[in-house]
A protein has these predicted regions:
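Transmembrane alpha-helical segments of integral membrane proteins
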Residues: 100, 231-247
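Interfacial loop-to-transmembrane junctions
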Residues: 242-264
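Membrane-embedded alpha-helical bundles of polytopic integral membrane proteins
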Residues: 1-224
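Alpha-helical transmembrane segments that form the membrane-embedded catalytic/substrate-binding core
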Residues: 10, 165-166, 185-197, 229-232, ...
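Re-entrant/interfacial helical elements at transmembrane boundaries that shape
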Residues: 169-171, 240-243, 266, 271
Length: 282
């Protein structure tokens, strides 16, 4: 009972913080830069527990956070001046340093160090940074505006999917979705979660009156988030099983670590960006 209360309180605070951050662009940038840093720090700490793996946690974390801020600057004009691609040069220099440094560190398995270093950037820093692509959109006259709904909807769809899948799976779940990796997930739960997300997408389109996306486009976005969010969850489960850990961390009481809370979004965010970009081509 105590664990349930702790888990509930943590969950409420977590959701409230995410939702509130999208009220102001500065709050969104601050919160998700912190989330990016904490998640990379957690990830690199986990992989460093493996034999012959020594990833530079500090520089990898700083690089990921810098990349998030660079994407913010590139996608917006909130901090003065036009977006300049030169902002990415320090990030590229840092990545080159992390690669070249292995020549002189004489580690037992530098290939693993390189692989995990780059994975931290591609798997964590890049997806979180792509939130800026969703949050900052240009109008027809070239003015950049802060879009609250698009990035927030990704998380709403993920939360609805998790809740719907849990409820339906608990009641009707009989056929395992991926027993080798996540025995608790069922096909019935996954389909049920998807149905709940479609209902949420329909509700958003109803109240938005096609001002941003049409009803079919909202529902398409919901399906993309469900499918890739589920894969993201399974990928993190495989990662933990490979490392032999139950939770990625304990920073969130009752919920585990940062990767445990954001695993679905790490695949859903890039997939949503690709989906919306594809819509813009037609």
């Amino acid at each position: 009972m105590k664990n349930f209360i702790v888990r509930t309180i943590t969950g409420v605070i977590f959701v409230a913080a995410i939702v509130a951050s999208f009220i102001r662009p500065e709050a969104m940038v601050l919160l998700f830069s912190i989330i990016t840093g904490l998640t990379i720090w957690e990830f690199t700490g986990l992989v460093n527990e493996r034999e012959n793996v020594t990833v530079n946690r500090f520089i990898s974390t700083v690089a990921g956070v810098y990349f998030f801020f660079a994407m913010t600057y590139f996608c917006s004009d909130l901090y003065g001046g036009s977006a300049k691609s030169v902002v990415f040069i320090p990030y590229l220099v840092t990545i080159i340093y992390l690669l070249v440094a292995e020549l002189y560190l004489k580690q037992a398995d530098p290939i693993q160090d390189w692989a995990y270093t780059m994975l931290a950037q591609m798997y964590i820093a890049l997806p979180f940074s792509l939130l800026n692509v969703l949050a900052f959109t240009a109008t027809n006259n070239g003015v950049v505006t802060f879009n609250t709904l698009l990035p927030l909807s990704i998380f709403v769809f993920l939360w609805v999917n998790d809740s719907g899948a849990y409820c339906v799976g608990s009641l009707l779940g009989k056929h395992k979705l991926f027993p080798r990796i996540s025995p608790g997930k069922s096909w019935e739960g996954s389909v049920g979660g998807g149905v709940f997300v479609l209902a949420a997408a329909y509700a958003i389109s109803y109240f938005m009156d096609d001002r941003m996306l049409t009803m079919p486009q909202w529902m398409g976005l919901g399906l993309v988030v469900v499918i890739f969010g589920t894969w993201g969850d399974l990928i993190e489960s495989l990662f933990k099983r490979t490392l032999g850990v139950k939770d990625s961390g304990n920073i969130l009481p009752g919920h585990g670590g940062m990767l445990d809370r954001f695993d679905s979004s790490l695949l859903a965010i890039p997939a949503a960006v690709i989906y919306l970009y594809t819509l813009s081509l037609f």
